[in-house]
């Protein structure tokens, strides 16, 4: 502790208390100055002393502070490392869960589609020859529906998902908590028409059922491709293997990543034709930068993975 002194001057502080002649504290002026005006004479004043305490840090406290700071930093570093390990473990578990779901659904849907095609045409062969027109129509609608789904997805993405259905699609533009997100509901919704078309085409004969069967196959093929490219390659929800090295698919992934940056007002809204959309709005330069960034990131991840395994 240290004491300090401070002073203050007050004029006539005791004027009312000591106004009697016996305790007059006024300064006596010499007679030579009595002729001056009263305004020029000295006034009465008092000096007040206030004792002020100042707290000083002791040497012991100053010596202990660096040790406590270093220990706190060590605890913080250990806590952050623990949190990072937990986050990586959770991400690994989520990717494994989604990979199992993707593989099972893809295998199941593909197997059912192949069996449906085989049994449908073999069932029709029992009653006679297969109509070439019906077979061609089934094949044409399969390709046409797969291509048409790209344009449907582009329109729905812009006019519905980023508009009236944004409350559901917003989960796809935020950090995901867990292996699934609310946006995955759209995949289930799109599976409904495919199941209906396949069922009607399988259990009925004729050209129209054959066309419906082909359309259902096309929607199914597009859904599987969309899942592996969009969920696996772009957002890395599960490993996709060698398709990450396909140049055009790498370009597709980079284009969709620019959609999430919102640099071109959400363009591209499509997936497989996303690079074409970016070209129309002058986004080729940004697309090339994103492709280079993804290549570097992929090589870095591959290098770290191989070093850790060795």
From Swiss-Prot:
Subcellular location: Plastid, Chloroplast membrane
Record-level GO cellular component terms: chloroplast membrane
Superkingdom to which the source organism belongs: Eukaryota
Enzymatic reactions: all-trans-beta-carotene + 4 reduced [2Fe-2S]-[ferredoxin] + 2 O2 + 4 H(+) = all-trans-zeaxanthin + 4 oxidized [2Fe-2S]-[ferredoxin] + 2 H2O
Span of the annotated motif Histidine box-1: 157-162
InterPro entries: BETA-OHASE-like, Fatty_acid_hydroxylase
Entry keyword set: Carotenoid biosynthesis, Chloroplast, Hydrolase, Iron, Membrane, Metal-binding, NAD, Oxidoreductase, Plastid, Transit peptide, Transmembrane, Transmembrane helix
Residue ranges of the motif Histidine box-2: 169-173
Keyword field contains Ribonucleoprotein: no
Fatty acid hydroxylase domain location: 145-272
Entry's EC annotation: 1.14.15.24
Function: Nonheme diiron monooxygenase involved in the biosynthesis of xanthophylls. Specific for beta-ring hydroxylations of beta-carotene. Also has a low activity toward the beta- and epsilon-rings of alpha-carotene. No activity with acyclic carotenoids such as lycopene and neurosporene. Uses ferredoxin as an electron donor.
Domain notes from UniProt: The histidine box domains may contain the active site and/or be involved in iron binding. The N-terminal part of the mature protein (70-129) is probably involved in the formation of a functional homodimer.
Protein name (Swiss-Prot/TrEMBL): Beta-carotene 3-hydroxylase 1, chloroplastic
Source organism: Arabidopsis thaliana (Mouse-ear cress)
Gene: BETA-OHASE 1
């Amino acid at each position: 502790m240290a004491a300090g002194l401070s002073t203050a001057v007050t004029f006539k502080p005791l004027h009312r208390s000591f106004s009697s002649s016996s305790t007059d504290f006024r300064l006596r002026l010499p007679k030579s100055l009595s002729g001056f005006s009263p305004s020029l004479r000295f006034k009465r004043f008092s000096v007040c002393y206030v004792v002020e305490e100042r707290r000083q840090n002791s040497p012991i406290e100053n010596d202990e502070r660096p040790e406590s700071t270093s220990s706190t930093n060590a605890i913080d570093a250990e806590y952050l490392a623990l949190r990072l390990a937990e986050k990586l473990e959770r991400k690994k578990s989520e990717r494994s869960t989604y990979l199992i779901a993707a593989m099972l659904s893809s295998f199941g849907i593909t197997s059912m589609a192949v069996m449906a095609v085989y049994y449908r045409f073999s069932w029709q062969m029992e009653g006679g020859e297969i109509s070439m027109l019906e077979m061609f129509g089934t094949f044409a609608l399969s390709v046409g529906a797969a291509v048409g789904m790209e344009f449907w997805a582009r329109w729905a993405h812009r006019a519905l998902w980023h508009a009236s259905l944004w409350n559901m699609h917003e989960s796809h533009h935020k950090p995901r908590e867990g292996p699934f997100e609310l946006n995955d509901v759209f995949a289930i919704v799109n599976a409904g028409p495919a199941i209906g078309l396949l069922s009607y085409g399988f259990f009925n004969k004729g050209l129209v059922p054959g066309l419906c069967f082909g359309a259902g196959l096309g929607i199914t093929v597009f859904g599987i491709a969309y899942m592996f490219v969009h969920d696996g390659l772009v957002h890395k929800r599960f490993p996709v293997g060698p398709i990450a090295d396909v140049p055009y698919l790498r370009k597709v992934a980079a284009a969709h990543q620019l959609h999430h940056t919102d640099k071109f007002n959400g363009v591209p809204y499509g997936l497989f034709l996303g690079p074409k959309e970016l070209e129309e709005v002058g986004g080729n330069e940004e697309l090339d930068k994103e492709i280079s960034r993804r290549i570097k990131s992929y090589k870095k991840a591959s290098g770290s993975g191989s070093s850790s395994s060795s």
